[in-house]
């Protein structure tokens, strides 16, 4: 954390914070930890940490730190047995925050205590470390709130190792058995509270050879997806990583290189798991195959190595459980429309260019899906539009059917609205992490599949066919879950109340015996009321004291002789009887056996669900596609979209097109539609677009790119009519800023982006350029702009012949239309009314000869004196007069 950066604190519940700290009991009683009585004031406020608290600092100055601020400073043999074990585990996981279960809390010590107390705003306290050690730093969190706190640590990029208790009762004179049961890292979390619901949480691993050929494995452990890439060139690798925005990237034995995007969470790994033999062995074991030909990986050695190393990392982070992964799927370069990072950023696909916000992005504007899995599916479609015309038409057919059949669309969306995230629920079940409430939510979702199948039985669109077939195995699973689990199970899995009566004979027998004991307790209460002549006597239970008889202080002096005083409170006295204490042991033993039996039954049921994780995920992905399609249909039906016609060749013809984001953001005026026609018949390949500043040229460029992209998603688009041929790539260069990190000026950034376009565009590409050459001297800029435009318009081999729109203030470029038959001039028109400039935002044929820059400056609020002086200088320039006088 940089100095001055604010740290985000979690706001603890008052009940949690109040019970989090208590005095340390004597050593001979429990292993519980000492907790101070005071609470930190304002625990939920954001505070700026002091400079010395910079967690990323390499400063070794220990001034102001506790004596034992690092576990490596102590002699393990001088520590208490519990802390000695903690230090042994910490030495094995030095880069991870170690949370060590002690009773109802997870504790951390030494440097981890200092870190968590600062990041999570926990009170830093201490624990006795040994006679020669004294007190060592300690901080703790309640075990039932661990997910909340761990989520914050993971969000900040820290890995967390959880050391849990492996037994409930220790042998006499021994510590409870504890060990690492889970490692939480940004790329391996499964818990719902640690994941963004509507986007994948990618874990990636890269293997690079000496010839810059690379293999990339990408897994989402929460959904089971495993994607493999193998290609050439680190530039393409960088683009792939920028697109993925992986939560964590595994690098085997190499440091971060220039191709590694800034801000990516990197985890260094040993080379061995990524070597060919180890990786192949891991893949065969995970997927139960004797050779890798069956997985289609025989000819992709680097992808295999990356996948094998990733699987080894997952196995190490999930001891005792196996995260269910689907068989690997190879992804090839020509599978989807290519969108480089700059194009994604310029078109604002998932975040706005100015401030990185979701609201205002294209995904924000078009996402009408109801489920988390539908939202993830739509995001994937947006990030990887199709190149297969058949697949695109299939999605179009489904949307058309749902648009035209409004009752069907509304019924489908009503069924989908409450559906849980079946894809991730299946993953948690397979990994043994699902709760009882997760299984109930899963049952509810599976019960909706037959209802969806019935609604879609007459549908003819291919994407809807996957849900038309009955799934008897999943229907039986839903029935099993409903039969065994109560409708509203508790959060805890260890305190009973999960399983219906009639499911298990042994459990029913234990419950019947407990009912008998409850009847006996009711009889005791009735009998003791009579014996004490106190009708207000209550028989109660406390976790620490067991069963007791409670009477008011006023009645406490007249109790029977066989009562034994146990506790005195301000308003009541508590007593026990020999008979009650003798029976208490039997009751508690029965409860423990009953709870354990329920837990065992639940785990068995969860394992049964996990065995069908693949089938559940298949159904979930079909539901996700339906949800995404139904959402796009709702958008099309309510926003006046049209179905674009897919054509062969290079046609891009859109009548009355609108920008889907801008038209939703406009509140006081209607969006002005505009048309475009490129790449076929007598239509140009290159449009030179001129017009005033702030008139809408950049919006028009983005609109054309967005509508091409939406069409290749299979979506309808905001237009009156459209005929669109498939593009292999979309390139945009709209605006540029200095790249301070690499020392590049605005002009150099602009030229680098332009060079990338000219090197990779083809006749089938769509190229959208704004203001090429503006960052240098006027004549240099004009010359560059002319040459670039001419190269785009010229057919191969002399140029690219790409469909292009070139927005510029160099009005000299209008002359290109006179020398190139496939170039046309268009302008964004304005009107001058009473010396005022009125922007019409309408694109019309013909080239502009003025940019109205001074009028735009006036509208932007430039002082009148400066505007007037600018007009004077313009007159001098246009009149050929010297500027200085």
Swiss-Prot record:
Belongs to the DNA mismatch repair MutS family. One of its GO terms (molecular function) is mismatched DNA binding. PANTHER family: DNA MISMATCH REPAIR PROTEIN MSH1, MITOCHONDRIAL, DNA MISMATCH REPAIR PROTEIN MUTS FAMILY MEMBER. It holds the Pfam family MutS_III. InterPro entries: DNA_mismatch_repair_MutS, DNA_mismatch_repair_MutS-lik_N, DNA_mismatch_repair_MutS/MSH, DNA_mismatch_repair_MutS_C, DNA_mismatch_repair_MutS_clamp, DNA_mismatch_repair_MutS_core, DNA_mismatch_repair_MutS_N, DNA_mismatch_repair_MutS_sf. It comes from the Bacteria. GO terms for cellular component: cytosol. Residues 26-36 have a biased composition (Basic and acidic residues). This is DNA mismatch repair protein MutS. SMART domains: MUTSac, MUTSd. Keywords: ATP-binding, DNA damage, DNA repair, DNA-binding, Nucleotide-binding. CDD domains: ABC_MutS1. Residues 1-67 are annotated as: Disordered. Coiled coil: none annotated. ATP binds at residues 691-698. The gene is mutS. The keyword Repeat does not apply. This protein is involved in the repair of mismatches in DNA. It is possible that it carries out the mismatch recognition step. This protein has a weak ATPase activity. One of its GO terms (biological process) is mismatch repair.
